């Protein structure tokens, strides 16, 4: 006989915020089919508002369960009870929707799988976490693989240790495996599950069935998260996340309760173990979901009160603006106005050349009466590919390729930098640059990209650096175990490293006996080496002790390890393929980050599921354009800088002052160390003097960080010992700030008697013109009338103070006794 059970599903007093009116209800899935006694589904009740937005009503609606075939929780989770049918009605005010539930298979034995059922429970209970038995040494003599990445190891650890004392098959409830987890036996980890709950019953059934191992069971191939990229109307509201897993045999399962759901920004929202997300303030945050080695992510937008917002149609310059404004309209943010012409000439010149514009360049640009877009586009075309552009972007690539005399010697550093400079100057296609680096052979002096294999000398290090540099993927985390936050496995780590196992090096006999390095820590290596493919050498897997065959982690399989061209050639073809989802995307994201100060994916060299793009459609469009342009870097530079988005003002409005993710306004940035150094000397018209470099050398022209300068080091110049963008710092701390006020670099540039600034002071009698020139040199704009007035007053005051100081010194001199 069917029983009627009514549940008031207003957990923790959750209610709909005032002012929101629901006009319809929808439940996903619309019908539930449970096929065994451990089966469950997480329902998601969505309410459509009169504004067109959707809200999660799962815990707000009144829930009525008709029938005893299923059990429903107030949070919307439905579990099997016995074979039969049931119906759940969800109601809110005068709205209601019914969900039929069909239950079968509860009387038949359900084979409990160690791989598919037990391992996920152990993970969810925290047993194999890094703070518990998944730590390097385990806990209390019991160790599991971290987050269950090695089921076979875990099974043996659980069943074989100490003569299988953890199981009592005659009386499963007295198994130490269950007694410790429920707190019935002493357990430092405390209570992890409760007697009689679904997890307890499942583990108990596994013991009853004989504690079997089933490594052949299909594994998870992907997980999907619902809802995707949703908007939550108000801070304080909640959203249920639902996770479905697909297995290798095509079957699917609701794994919401077993999945790990985490917030990417705990200031915007927080996630509960049940998958319910609570919003805290207006903003955006990624939701990272992981389940049994599979990862997925989505983005939640917390809208907040946007009463009075009205979208204003804004002109667009290219597809970039179309994608940016589409997102801004969705999140109810208005873009800033365009920056002024003087702001633009300064911004684009610094970004593209690493130098500020000269006063003459500023005056010429401001005096040009043509349409602003026309002259801005023309300036971009002029700067891209210029000599200053080449030096600036050569320096960027010298960072990434680790041009460092510590590894290469002075000759090698200069040679590699010159090769990079030629590549930038000729606008070498990006895929060609990557291929030439990855396949380089011969003398490191005669073929400088071969120095890549001189800087990094082991297969594992080469693999980690290469995936980081050209794919923005951090493979180093899966060396000792499967990646804890990504899909990459330990097997893939060694299989990828195998592509570099046959890189050979031998001394270049033209430089016999000349070495670099050599210490108690590091051995000396030949100054110049010949890089070649040896045809021999393998990588040994750390866990298995066996040789790892070369294989790609996604897309395609290696046909044969000894294929024509060798392993590095095959790897280069795979990495630079237009079908490689990471190659082009990672570099356009870098370019965007360099020009905007923040990447669409940020950090700009960290692409992973838990770090989704702030605007996926924009990133896809940029990637597509880059590929279709045949990896033309200068084309992408022009496209980005000509967009209206790049030209937004730093001045915010009432609707975008709190936006940091969607490029609705420009974000002020601290200049990089080399740019700041060069800007100081260009603005003052002084000559640079860097020890070990020719007089007048730009900081951006220095071959490497081995040319020492305290100013550059204080302001975060990278040491070039890794490909990580984190080597360069752009923060503002007191020490460097004080050096801008009274440090020797600034002081010497100002005091240089031969500087253009000092000559101007000596020859220009009109103080107003002098002030105008100073503003143009340092700020790339004309001063306002008020600024001229205040500056004139300051000049007069300084002259008076100077006269007083001279007079005081003269009086003091009279008091000094004559010798």
Question: Which residue stretches match the model-derived regions?
Answer:
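Primarily short, surface-exposed interaction patches in extracytoplasmic proteins
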Residues: 312-388, 393-692, 718, 726-727, ...
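Signal/transit-peptide handling
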Residues: 592-595, 698-704, 713, 736-751
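Sequence context surrounding c-type heme c attachment/ligation sites in exported
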Residues: 100-155, 166-174, 183-204, 213-216, ...
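Short, glycine-/polar-rich solvent-exposed loops and beta-turns at beta-strand/coil boundaries
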Residues: 136-138, 194, 218-219, 337-342, ...
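Short basic-aromatic helix/loop recognition motifs at nucleic-acid
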Residues: 165-169, 608-611
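Catalytic and ligand-binding motifs that coordinate phosphates/metal ions
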Residues: 682-714
């Amino acid at each position: 006989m069917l029983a009627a059970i009514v549940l008031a599903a207003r957990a923790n007093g959750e209610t709909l915020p005032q002012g929101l009116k629901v006009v319809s209800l929808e439940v996903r899935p619309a019908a539930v089919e449970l096929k065994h006694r451990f089966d469950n589904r997480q329902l998601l009740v969505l309410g459509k508002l009169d504004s067109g937005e959707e809200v999660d009503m799962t815990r707000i609606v009144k829930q009525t369960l008709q029938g005893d075939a299923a059990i429903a929780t107030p949070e919307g989770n439905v579990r099997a009870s016995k074979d039969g049918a049931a119906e759940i009605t969800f109601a809110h005010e005068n709205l209601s929707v019914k969900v039929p539930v069909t239950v079968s298979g509860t009387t038949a034995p359900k084979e409990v799988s160690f791989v598919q059922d037990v391992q996920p429970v152990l993970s969810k209970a925290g047993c194999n976490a890094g703070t518990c038995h998944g730590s390097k040494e385990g806990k209390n003599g019991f160790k599991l693989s971290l987050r269950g990445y090695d089921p076979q190891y875990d099974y043996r650890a659980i069943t074989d240790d100490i003569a299988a004392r953890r199981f009592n098959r005659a009386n499963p409830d007295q198994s130490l495996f269950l007694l410790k987890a429920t707190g019935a036996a002493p357990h430092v980890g405390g209570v992890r599950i409760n007697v009689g709950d679904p997890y307890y019953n499942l583990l108990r059934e596994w013991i009853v069935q004989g504690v079997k191992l089933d490594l052949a069971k299909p594994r998870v191939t992907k997980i999907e998260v619902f809802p995707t990229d949703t908007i939550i109307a108000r801070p304080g509201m909640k959203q249920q996340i639902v996770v479905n897993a697909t297995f290798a045999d095509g079957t699917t399962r609701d794994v919401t309760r077993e999945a790990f759901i985490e917030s990417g920004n705990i200031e915007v929202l927080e996630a509960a173990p049940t998958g319910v997300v609570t919003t805290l303030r207006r903003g955006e945050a990624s939701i990272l979901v992981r389940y049994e080695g599979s990862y997925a992510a989505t983005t939640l937008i917390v809208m907040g009160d946007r009463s009075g917002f009205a979208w204003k149609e804004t002109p667009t310059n290219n597809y970039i603006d179309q994608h940016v404004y589409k997102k801004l309209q969705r999140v109810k943010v208005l873009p800033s106005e365009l920056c002024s012409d003087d702001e633009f000439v300064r911004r684009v010149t610094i970004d593209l050349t690493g130098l500020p514009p000269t006063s003459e360049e500023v005056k010429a640009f401001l005096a040009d009466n043509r349409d602003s877009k026309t002259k801005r586009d023309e300036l971009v075309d002029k700067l891209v590919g210029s000599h200053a552009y080449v030096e600036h972007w050569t320096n960027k690539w010298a960072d990434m390729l680790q041009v460092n005399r510590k590894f290469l010697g002075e000759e090698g550093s200069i040679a590699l930098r010159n090769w990079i400079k030629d590549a930038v100057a000729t606008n070498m296609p990006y895929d060609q640059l990557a291929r030439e680096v990855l396949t380089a052979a011969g003398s490191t002096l005669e073929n400088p990209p071969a120095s890549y294999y001189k800087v990094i000398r082991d297969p594992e290090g080469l693999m980690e650096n290469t995936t980081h540099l050209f794919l923005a993927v951090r493979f180093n985390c899966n060396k000792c175990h499967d990646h804890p936050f990504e899909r990459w496995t330990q097997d893939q780590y060694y299989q990828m490293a195998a592509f570099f196992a046959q890189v050979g090096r031998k001394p270049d006999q033209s430089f016999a006996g000349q070495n670099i390095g050599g210490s108690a820590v590091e051995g000396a290596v030949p100054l110049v080496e010949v890089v070649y493919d040896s045809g021999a050498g393998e990588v040994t897997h750390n866990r298995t002790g066996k040789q790892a065959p070369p294989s790609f982690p996604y897309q395609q399989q290696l046909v044969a390890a000894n294929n024509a061209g060798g392993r590095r050639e095959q790897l280069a073809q795979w990495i630079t393929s237009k079908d490689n989802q990471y190659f082009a995307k990672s570099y356009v994201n870098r370019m965007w980050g360099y020009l905007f100060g923040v990447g669409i994916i940020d950090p700009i060299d960290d692409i992973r599921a838990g770090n989704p793009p702030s605007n996926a459609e924009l990133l896809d469009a940029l990637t597509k354009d880059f590929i279709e342009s045949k990896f033309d870097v200068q084309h992408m530079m022009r496209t980005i800088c000509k967009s209206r988005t790049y030209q937004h003002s730093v001045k915010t409005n009432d609707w975008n002052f709190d936006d940091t993710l969607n490029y609705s306004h420009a974000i002020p940035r601290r200049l990089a160390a080399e740019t700041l150094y060069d800007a100081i000397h260009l603005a003052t018209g002084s000559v640079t003097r860097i020890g070990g470099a020719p007089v007048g050398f730009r900081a951006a022209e220095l071959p490497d960080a081995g040319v020492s300068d305290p100013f550059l080091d204080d302001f975060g110049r990278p040491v070039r010992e890794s490909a990580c963008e984190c080597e360069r710092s752009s923060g503002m701390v007191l020490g460097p700030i004080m050096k801008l006020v009274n440090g020797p670099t600034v002081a010497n540039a100002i005091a240089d008697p031969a500087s253009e600034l000092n000559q101007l002071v000596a020859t220009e009698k009109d103080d107003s013109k002098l002030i105008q020139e100073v503003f143009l040199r340092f700020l790339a704009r004309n001063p306002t009338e008020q600024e001229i007035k205040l500056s004139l007053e300051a000049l007069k005051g300084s002259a008076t103070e100077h006269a007083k100081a001279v007079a005081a010194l003269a009086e003091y001199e009279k008091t000094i006794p004559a010798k």
